[in-house]
Amino acid sequence: MDMDPWLLLTLILGLAMAWAIGANDAANSMSTAVGAGAITPKQAVLIAGILEFTGAYFFGKTVTETIRKGIIDPSRISDPNVLVYGSLAALLGATIWLVIATKYGLPVSTTHSIIGGIVGYGVVYAGLEIVNWGKMASVVLSWILSPIVGAIFAFFIFKAIRRTVLESEDPIRSAKRWSPVWIGLAFVVIGTMFYIKVLHGKSLYMGVLKLGIPVGLVVFLITSMILRVKFPKVDPYLGAEFIFRRVQVITSGYVALAHGANDVANAIGPVAAVYTIATMGMAGAKVPVPRWILALGGLGIAIGVATYGYRVMETVGKKITELTNTRGFTIDFSAATVVLIASWLGMPISTTHTVVGAVIGVGLARGVKAINKSIVRDIIISWFVTVPVAGLISAIIFKILWIVG
């Protein structure tokens, strides 16, 4: 087969997938900051766009797996044409589902979408035995674990922040004492996450020592100084909210940067596979990723956030429950902590599901009536149909390509 038109088509679909990731998943990173009023939607898309591109281009992995997450057995695919058609089908299946979900403002997992696409074409080509069902079980487990653990963490962290900062007997003293502690702890987690997720460090222990503790300590000292100098005797609640508002922009910005570094692979993995086949004849289990393909993925994500990200931002930031800066900070802190612990334990986790779970947890800390139950129901349904719908679309597209190709 002549590879040039197939490579061009894959590049176009990779860009489309990156756009869809930006519109849905990347928009999620800024949703709590927008919902809490820390920044405007226009500021959010600008910040997210720049940081997503930066994360993808400068910190995206230069080697990516052709078969994401080991979800199907690559030894059963020896024909390069199958990998080309499969990559196209998986990209298109995932992209179509992400666009549908985004249109209705539903935050879904882009990783689960591409997994569905891969399983769809794999089953059509080689039957059910090609699927690693143990791995699929861990994906299903992540649907259940991620939001529950995220909600539990956020519920208790917000209760603790409310008790130590917002509702204590001596609020001025408590705000000065405890706000820097909570913010410092959050930055220990964020510094460690940056080491592992963005710089791709292997050791959690080294991440805590090299970046986590130093960053957390510096932020603790800066926050303490600001509260003492700028808010000596004024309303401590306003002082705490002021600090949390500024911090929330930083935590959301980190989420955007890390998301670009990690999830760009969902769009460019299949593109890199087809590019390697076009230039070298066949792709192995891992393929090199040229910088220009990383740039393509980063650009697509940035454009997606800017042009269509507002729908998911509105759902997560405003429709599930009412957010303030302390609640928004709690969500970011909880989600980052859960993802870090899950990575350390090797547990399957979805960042999207964890963030939504944390939003629900913060709402539940104020009572069940603070939650928009119909929105939560729609989101949960969308999570459970993500893999089957993306898989079905991918299967149909692969079958058509296999027949006409």
UniProtKB/Swiss-Prot annotation:
Coiled coil: none
Subcellular location: Cell membrane
Keywords: Cell membrane, Membrane, Phosphate transport, Transmembrane, Transmembrane helix, Transport
GO molecular function: phosphate transmembrane transporter activity
Domain of life: Archaea
Known role: Potential transporter for phosphate.
PANTHER family, A to Z: PHOSPHATE TRANSPORTER (PTHR11101:SF80)
Name of the protein described by the UniProt record: Putative phosphate permease PYRAB14010
Organism the protein comes from: Pyrococcus abyssi (strain GE5 / Orsay)
